[in-house]
Amino acid sequence: MSDTIAAIATAHGVGSISIVRLSGERALEFALRFSRKTKLTPRHATFTKLFNQNNEIIDEAIMIYFKAPYSFTGEDIVEFQTHGGFSVSEVLLEELVSLGARFALAGEFSKRACLNGKMTPLKALNIQDLILSKSALAAKIIARNMQGNLGELLEKIRTDLVKTLAFVETSIDYADDDLPSDLLEKISTMCEENSKILKEIYTLSQSKKGLIEGFKIAIIGKPNVGKSSLLNALLSYERAIVSDIAGTTRDTIEESFKLGTHLLRIIDTAGIRESKDTIEQIGVALSKKSLEDADIILAVFDASRVQDKEDEKIFELLANTDKKIFWILNKSDLENVFKNTRNKNFIKLSAQKDIALLKEELQNYLNSFDSEGIMVSSLDLINACKISSEAIFRAKELLEESSLELFAFELNLAINELARFTKDFQRDEILDEMFGNFCLGK
C-alpha cells in the first residue's frame, strides 16, 4: 500500500460542494504542491487556491489534512473541498494522477482502513449499508450496529471459540490426558449458548429484513378487480394503465413508496385466470412467483361482481400461505353483490376514491414489528452466522461423542466464518492461548 490513491468522494452531478480525497504516503506532498503552501496543520481547515502544473488556478477550495495514523485509512489523508459540478473535481483528480497518484478502486479507502486496523470488515459493511439505507428506520438499525454491539458480540463469540479450541487441541496432542468432566460441561454449555445467539441473529434478520430492505407487497386478484387502480392510489400517481379491459396488466410492475417510517416495495401483478394467451400465461406465472417473494399480500376482490370460479382460485391459491394477507373488497362505492362465503375480514374501499383505511391498517401492522434486537442486512453475514451456528451445534454433539478431532474441525469452521467480519484468524492465536499463561522462561 505504498502508492497514493485519489477519488471523488461525493456523488457525481451538480452540487454546491465536491470532495476529492487523497490517501497515501505522498498525500501531503501533493497537497502542498497544488496549494503552494509550505505546511498544513493536521485537522485544520485551510482556505487556499489550487493550481495546476502550469501554475493556472483550478479553484478556490478548503483543504483538510489528516496525519497518519489519525485518519480514516490510517495513512496520511488530504481532503479537497472544491466547488461542485462536473468539471472542477474531475480536473483536480486528473492533476493528482498526473503527479503520481493512482485512481482508487471501488471501496479501496475502506479496504485500507481495515488493513491498517482502523475498522473491522463488519464496520465497513455497516457503513456501506448505512449509505445505501432506504428509510429512516433502516438507518437507525444500521447505525445501532455501527456502535459496536454486533461487532463486540461476534468478537466475543470468536474469542470463546479460539480459547476452547486451544484447550481441545492441547488435549488431542496429549491423548493420554482426558479433558476434565467439569471442563467438558463448560465447553458444551458455551457451544450451546453461542450457537443459540448466532441462530437468533440470522433468524431475526431474515424474519425482519423488511425493516431494513423494505417490505415487499404483492397485489393479487383476478383480472379487472382494480389492482392497478390500487397501486396508483398507494403511490399517489398513475404508474399503471387502468382499463375496463380484463388482462390489461400482463407483466409485474414494481415501485417503492414510503408509509410513515417504512419503505414499501409494491408489486402489481397480472390478473390470475385461465387463459390460452401465451403472454398472459407468462404474466400469471410471474404473479405466482411474486407471491412467493412477498412479505405482505393484498388480495383484491370486486364488490360489484358476483363471486365466481376465478375468485375461488385466488382463495385456494392463498389457503396455505403463511404470509400476512389483507383481504380487500374494492369498488365498495358501487352496489355490493359479492358474497363473503369465506368469512374473511375484508377492508371495504374504493381505490379510485379513498384508501385511507388500508393505509392505516398497513401502518398499524408495520409498526407492530419490533426494531430492537440485533439485525443485519448483509446476506453474506447472515449466511456466516448461520454456518457458524450450525458448525458450533455440530461441534457440541461431537464433543459429547468424544470425537475431539472432528470437534476441532467444526470449531475451526465457525471461527473462520466469524473472523471474516471481525479480525483475521491466525493460527498463532491458538499458540498464544496455549502458552500465554506459562511462567517466564518456561
From Swiss-Prot:
Binding of GTP, residues: 224-229, 243-249, 268-271
Cofactor, free-text remark: Binds 1 potassium ion per subunit.
Disulfides per UniProt: none
InterPro entries attached to this UniProt entry: G_TrmE, GTP-bd, GTP-bd_TrmE_N, GTPase_MnmE, MnmE_dom2, MnmE_helical, P-loop_NTPase, Small_GTP-bd
Any one GO CC term of the record: cytosol
Subcellular location: Cytoplasm
Entry binding sites for K(+): 224, 243, 245, 248
E.C. numbers: 3.6.-.-
Keywords: Cytoplasm, GTP-binding, Hydrolase, Magnesium, Metal-binding, Nucleotide-binding, Potassium, tRNA processing
CDD domains, sorted: trmE (cd04164), TrmE_N (cd14858)
Cofactor(s) recorded in Swiss-Prot or TrEMBL: K(+)
SUPFAM superfamilies: Folate-binding domain, P-loop containing nucleoside triphosphate hydrolases
Residue ranges of domain TrmE-type G in the record: 214-367
Residues annotated as signal peptide: none
GO BP of this protein: tRNA methylation; tRNA wobble uridine modification
Residues given in the record as Mg(2+) binding sites: 228, 249
EC class of the enzyme, as a word: hydrolase
Residues annotated for (6S)-5-formyl-5,6,7,8-tetrahydrofolate binding in this entry: 21, 79, 118, 442
Gene3D superfamilies reported for this sequence: P-loop containing nucleotide triphosphate hydrolases, Probable tRNA modification gtpase trme, domain 1, tRNA modification GTPase MnmE domain 2
Subunit structure: Homodimer. Heterotetramer of two MnmE and two MnmG subunits.
PANTHER family listed in its UniProt record: TRNA MODIFICATION GTPASE GTPBP3 (PTHR42714), TRNA MODIFICATION GTPASE GTPBP3, MITOCHONDRIAL (PTHR42714:SF2)
The protein's role, per its UniProt record: Exhibits a very high intrinsic GTPase hydrolysis rate. Involved in the addition of a carboxymethylaminomethyl (cmnm) group at the wobble position (U34) of certain tRNAs, forming tRNA-cmnm(5)s(2)U34.
Homology family: Belongs to the TRAFAC class TrmE-Era-EngA-EngB-Septin-like GTPase superfamily. TrmE GTPase family.
Name assigned to this protein: tRNA modification GTPase MnmE
Species annotation: Campylobacter jejuni subsp. doylei (strain ATCC BAA-1458 / RM4099 / 269.97)
